[in-house]
């Protein structure tokens, strides 16, 4: 993997900087590194493809070295370099696609394609290493079963979940009370509602709670908390739990009371925030507990009082909500996030070349299913294919 990254970094630098008119002295270090790569690769043969519809291709390396000059690089010099660079880039592209198409239940962190296994041989260690990539650094740590750390922005840590629970259910009488939520990606939105606006609740207060367990623990997370759940702020028709009927939801938004956010790790509370909105941090957690209250307003103007009558029918439904959004965090496991296209790159290659469903990844690389059942085998394979995708993205956009 280190060799694959180093070759790609060398090719990227050469493609960007070996251009007509450039002084040789300005790119001599790159050319020297480029020539070392050629010397190491010459005389070797590789084969890629042969999975799904990815075609089998054979690769042979026999290229001349780039020479020295005291002057600027001319068109002939650059053309010779370009021919070599384009062949190498095509080779790296196919090695990466071959690797992204493969998976293994055992030791999925290790190279799976014949070409990348061969590149892992001792003879290729002479290629100048450049291990500045976060993915390469973490791949090396994971390969040695040491602790890794990925920095994510808006990590896709929550499997998609959209549902509701009813604590009071009288749909025929238009009198419901409960919680509805939408968890997806890096965001939780949860709303508590009471059609009667806590009319007969103790002290005219309804208590709501929403607990979310993460599939992987996060550390040093920056989180935004808002006293609203905008996705539940407009009327809708909702199917009953048994699918036998539907019920109408017509929310009127109130501000939640006694909001408390708890972050837990292995059942122990690590951080607690009460009535705190905006930006907060959480040190280390694998569970989030949100609790909040709906309080019937003790004093109401006639207009508000008309919204929340003392008896049925309840045409407007008191609703309070919270939004929790993970803006950034560190995780020991690789995840998809909003700043990267690794999941999309891997999925696109597997779809384009009709890669058959294997023993590890779900059909279509369905992220909700993948993260819901995030096994060690999936973690190893995902880290490997994401690392390869990050290498490929240096050369292929």
Swiss-Prot record:
The N-terminus is blocked. The keyword Ubl conjugation applies. GO terms for molecular function: host cell surface receptor binding; metal ion binding; structural molecule activity. Keywords: Calcium, Capsid protein, Intermediate capsid protein, Metal-binding, Ubl conjugation, Virion, Zinc. It is found in: Virion. Zn(2+) binds at residue 153. Residues 62-73 are annotated as: Interaction with the inner capsid protein VP2. GO terms for biological process: fusion of virus membrane with host plasma membrane. The keyword Ubl conjugation applies. It comes from the Viruses. GO terms for cellular component: viral envelope; viral intermediate capsid. Intermediate capsid protein that self assembles to form an icosahedral capsid with a T=13 symmetry, which consists of 230 trimers of VP6, with channels at each of its five-fold vertices. This capsid constitutes the middle concentric layer of the viral mature particle. The innermost VP2 capsid and the intermediate VP6 capsid remain intact following cell entry to protect the dsRNA from degradation and to prevent unfavorable antiviral responses in the host cell during all the replication cycle of the virus. Homotrimer. Interacts with the inner capsid protein VP2. Interacts with the outer capsid glycoprotein VP7. Interacts with the outer capsid protein VP5*. Belongs to the rotavirus VP6 family. The VP6 trimer contains a zinc ion located at the center of the molecule. The zinc ion is not essential for either trimerization or transcription activity of the DLP. Zinc-depleted VP6 has an increased sensitivity to proteases. This is Intermediate capsid protein VP6. It comes from Rotavirus A (isolate RVA/Equine/United Kingdom/L338/1988/G13P12[18]) (RV-A).
């Amino acid at each position: 993997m280190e060799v694959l990254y180093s070759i790609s970094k060398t090719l990227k630098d050469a493609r960007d900087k070996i251009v007509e008119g450039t002084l040789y002295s300005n790119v001599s270090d790159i050319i020297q590194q480029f020539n070392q790569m050629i010397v190491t690769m010459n005389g070797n043969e590789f084969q890629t493809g042969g999975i799904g519809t990815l075609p089998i291709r054979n690769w042979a390396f026999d290229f001349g070295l780039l020479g020295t000059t005291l002057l600027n690089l001319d068109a002939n010099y650059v053309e010779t370099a370009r021919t070599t660079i384009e062949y190498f880039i095509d080779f790296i592209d196919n090695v990466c696609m071959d690797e992204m198409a493969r998976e293994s239940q055992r030791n999925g962190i290790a190279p799976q394609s014949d070409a990348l296994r061969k590149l892992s041989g001792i003879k290729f260690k002479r290629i100048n290493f450049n291990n500045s990539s976060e993915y390469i650094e973490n791949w090396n740590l994971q390969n040695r079963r040491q602790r890794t750390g990925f920095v994510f922005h808006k990590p896709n840590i929550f499997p998609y979940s959209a549902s509701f629970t009813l604590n009071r259910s009288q749909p025929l009488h238009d009198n419901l009370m409960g919680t509805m939520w939408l968890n997806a990606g890096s965001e939780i939105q949860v709303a508590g509602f009471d059609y009667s606006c806590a009319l007969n609740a103790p002290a005219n207060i309804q208590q709501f709670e929403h607990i979310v367990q993460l599939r992987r623990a996060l550390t040093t997370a920056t989180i935004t908390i808002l006293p609203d759940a905008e996705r539940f702020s407009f009327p809708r028709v909702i199917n009953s739990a048994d699918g036998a009927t539907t019920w109408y939801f017509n929310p009127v938004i109130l501000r939640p009371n006694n909001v408390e956010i708890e972050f837990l790790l292995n059942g122990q509370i690590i951080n607690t925030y009460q009535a705190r909105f905006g930006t907060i941090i959480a040190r280390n957690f694998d569970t989030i507990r949100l609790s909040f209250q709906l309080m019937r307003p003790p004093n109401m103007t006639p207009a508000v009082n008309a919204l929340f009558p003392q008896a049925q029918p309840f045409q407007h439904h008191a609703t309070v909500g919270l939004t929790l959004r993970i803006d950034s965090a560190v995780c020991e496991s690789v995840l998809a996030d909003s700043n990267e296209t690794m999941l999309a790159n891997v999925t696109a290659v597997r779809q384009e070349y009709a890669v058959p469903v294997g023993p590890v990844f779900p059909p279509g690389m369905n992220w909700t299913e993948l993260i819901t059942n995030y096994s060690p085998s999936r973690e190893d394979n995902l880290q490997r294919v994401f690392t390869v995708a990050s290498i490929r993205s240096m050369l292929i956009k």
